[in-house]
Amino acid sequence: MKIVAIGIGQCGCNIADQFYAINDYSKSFFGRRIEILTDAFAVNTDDTDLSSLKYIPRDMSHRIVIGATRTSGHGVGKVNYEGATIMKESLPVIIDDVLNSRNFYACDAVMVIASGAGGTGSGGIGPLVSALRERVGKPVYAIVVLPFGYEELRETSYAVVNTATCLKTVNQVADAVFVLDNERFGRGSVSLARNLEVVNQQMVRNFFDLFCAGEEGRQKFVGSTVVDAGDIKQSLESISTIGRGEATLPIFHRWKKNHYKESSNGAISLVGALSQAINNLCLNVGAEDARTILALLCAPQDIINLNAVTEISNHLQQRAPKAEIRIADYPRRAREISITLVLSTLTSVGRTENIYLKATELLNKRKALIEEVDSSIKRVEELCAGIPILV
C-alpha cells in the first residue's frame, strides 16, 4: 500500500518526516527495495518548526507555511479555532500541491497526521480531511496524537478541550482515525525531546510491514494470503489503533528446523509476538473492544505453517469472539518474527471517553472563570472611575 503523508502542526510534521525517512530506507538497496510513500508534505503556521524537519524536501510545495499574514510565521498559540480558520483559507493551495505531486495517481490512500492538543494541527486536520475526501477519490485516514498526562492536569487545560474537539470532528469526516496515546510510550527518565522522537519512530514503524506486504514484488517474499490496499480499506473504520510485536528465533534455527524440539517453537514465538503486539497497541484497549481485526504475520516461510496460523486465529477468536478477523502472511528471511495488529471499529475507548468528560467539565468551568474575571475587571474599573487618564 502506498500513501501520501500530510503532517499538520509541529507534531504531525515530525511524524510525516519519519514516514519520509522510513520510505527512503525501504527503497534503498539495504532495505526492501519497496516504495510505500509517493510523497510527503508538512503544513504549519510556524516556519521555525518546518525548518527543523530532516527529510521532507525543503521546497515550498512540500513545506507549506499557511496563515503567514495572520501569524507572521509564529503559530496560532494553541488556539484551534484560529488554526481551523487559517486551514480553510489555505485549502486550495494545499490540495493543489498534493494533487500535482509526483506519482499521486499511484497512491492508494492519504494519511493526515496531527496532534490533538495543539492549535494548527488540532484545528486544521478536520477541514483538510473533509476537503481531501471530496477531491481525491481515495480513502483519507487520520492519525491523531493524544497529549501527555501532565498536559491534562491544569483546570484550564487547552490540551483536553482541543483534543476532544479534534477527535469529534475528525471521526465524523475521516474514513478511519488512528489514535496514538503519548502516554503509552513515554518514559519518565528520558528527556522530552527523546520521548517525542521515540513515539514518532514507533508509530511509523508500526505501519512498515503492513504497507510493504502489498507492494512486495519478489516472489519469495509474497505471502500465501497477501494483505493489500483493498484488505486494509475493508478493515478500517472509525476509531482504530495499531501495534507491533516481535520475537527472535535461535541463531541456528535454519539448520535445526527439522528437529522435533523446533516443531512447536515457531507457533510459540508467533503467539508471543501477538501478545507483545497487543501490549504495544498505540491506545490502551483490548482486542475484545474491536469489531474488525487485521493481523499480519512476518516470519520465515517454515514458521508460517498451518498450525501456527491456526494457533494465532484461535488466540484472536478467544480474545475477540465478536470481531471479523483477517490474517495475512508476509514471508521474510533472517530470524525475526513480528506481528502487526490493527484493531478497528473500537466500541469502547476509555482514554477518549475520559477526554470527552474532562473537556465538558473544563468548558463549564471556563465559562464560570470568564464570568469571574469579567466581574473582577468591572470592579477595578469602578474603583478607578474618578481618576483621570493622560491620553
Please name every model-derived segment.
Residues 1-391:
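Tubulin/FtsZ superfamily GTPase core signature
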